[in-house]
């Protein structure tokens, strides 16, 4: 099994060294494809990309995919700057980010690669918080509810220790929009999701939120909280409730790709094709949820049409040039 390294675990995020060599997984590197595609972005999406690269590297030892995990917002900044070919994101691109790309004449393609459920969890020893609605969550994360008793009069009068990702993360943006109605999050913030999990496990009054796979990996140390929808139905995050969107904090996960990279970088276009043909298997292996199969098929059809169109355009330009040279 190939081992993956995290380099530079600073506040700016770690970088995954991916697909750099064929490894003890039986990979013979039998592809003629050579080159590199660079990405950065969501730490939530990073485990999926890692799983994809375990498979990719088996047959593409000379086609490298490097992907950082600086956070969705930081990834989009690099994408806008033209420093990377693709950006991993745990939220849709914002209007202001779209505008900055437009101002730089950078066109992009959006690919939905999986689904996630932002999971709210409390300490394993918490025996009273089983479910919350969004208003209660908002009270906790706005700082208006200082103690559990402020949330529910039947709960203990003990100070809540709320922890949140910081604003560089798409998970933060999602929570801010879906729960806070864009009101400020007033809680301890951390760039490292594993540190958030650790904080909740160590503090009996702790509460935090993160991607579903972080809960799955730590379910023996955490207690998940059911979230009530607008009709008051409390639902826990599972693969089924996340995929059918019955879980109130379900969300899609994305890869955004620079169109120029899709046209000019064969490694980039082949990797995205590979991602879509995987049909969410890597996402499932990483602890997330595959999108409906038709989602991958329609996106793959669109990608192939885009590549074919540009190939025909390039062929025409080549033929025109040859004709000019003969004159």
Curated annotation (Swiss-Prot):
NCBIfam families with a match to the protein in the record: ptsS_2 (TIGR02136)
Cited function: Part of the ABC transporter complex PstSACB involved in phosphate import.
Signal peptide stretch: 1-20
Lipid-substituted positions (N-palmitoyl cysteine): 21
Membrane topology recorded in Swiss-Prot or TrEMBL: Lipid-anchor
Protein name per Swiss-Prot or TrEMBL: Phosphate-binding protein PstS
Lipid moiety-binding region (S-diacylglycerol cysteine): 21
Record key words, sorted: Cell membrane, Lipoprotein, Membrane, Palmitate, Phosphate transport, Signal, Transport
Subunit field text: The complex is composed of two ATP-binding proteins (PstB), two transmembrane proteins (PstC and PstA) and a solute-binding protein (PstS).
InterPro entries referenced in this protein's UniProt entry, alphabetically: PBP_domain, Phos-bd, Phosphate_ABC_transporter
GN (gene name): pstS
Sample GO molecular function, one term: phosphate ion binding
GO biological process, one term: phosphate ion transport
Annotated compartments: Cell membrane
Database matches in Pfam families: PBP_like_2 (PF12849)
GO cellular component: plasma membrane
Protein transport among keywords: no
Region (Disordered): 307-327
Chief localisation class: membrane
Family stated for the protein in its record: Belongs to the PstS family.
Gene3D superfamilies tied to this protein: Periplasmic binding protein-like II
PROSITE patterns attached to this UniProt entry: PROKAR_LIPOPROTEIN
């Amino acid at each position: 099994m190939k081992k993956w390294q995290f380099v530079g675990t600073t506040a700016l995020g770690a970088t995954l060294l991916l697909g750099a060599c064929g490894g003890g997984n039986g990979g013979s590197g039998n592809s003629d494809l050579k080159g590199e595609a660079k990405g950065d972005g969501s730490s939530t999406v990073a485990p999926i990309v890692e799983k994809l690269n375990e498979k990719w590297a088996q047959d593409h030892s000379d086609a490298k995919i490097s992907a950082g995990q600086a956070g969705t917002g930081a990834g989009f900044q690099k994408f806008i700057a033209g420093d990377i070919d693709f950006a991993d994101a745990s939220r849709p691109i914002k209007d202001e980010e779209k505008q900055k790309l437009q101002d730089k004449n950078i066109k992009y393609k959006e690919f939905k690669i999986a689904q996630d459920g932002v999971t709210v969890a409390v300490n394993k020893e918490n025996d009273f918080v089983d479910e919350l609605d969004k208003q209660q969550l908002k009270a906790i994360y706005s700082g208006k509810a200082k103690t559990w008793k402020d949330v529910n009069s039947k709960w203990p009068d003990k100070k809540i220790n709320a922890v949140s990702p910081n604003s560089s993360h798409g998970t933060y943006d999602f929570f801010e929009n879906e729960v806070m109605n864009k009101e400020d999050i007033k809680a301890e913030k951390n760039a490292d999701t594993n540190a958030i999990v650790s904080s909740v496990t160590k503090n009996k009054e702790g509460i935090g939120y993160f991607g579903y796979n972080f809960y799955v990996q730590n379910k023996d140390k955490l207690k998940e909280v059911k979230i009530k929808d607008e009709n008051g139905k409390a639902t826990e995050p599972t693969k089924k409730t996340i995929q059918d969107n019955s879980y109130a904090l379900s969300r899609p996960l994305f890869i955004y790709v620079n169109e120029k990279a899709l046209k000019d970088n064969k490694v980039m276009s082949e990797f995205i094709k590979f991602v879509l043909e995987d049909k969410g298997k890597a996402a499932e292996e990483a602890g997330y949820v595959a999108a409906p199969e038709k989602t991958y098929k329609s996106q793959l059809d669109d990608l192939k049409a885009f590549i074919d169109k540009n190939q025909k355009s390039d062929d025409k330009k080549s033929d025109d040039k040859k004709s000019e040279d003969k004159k």
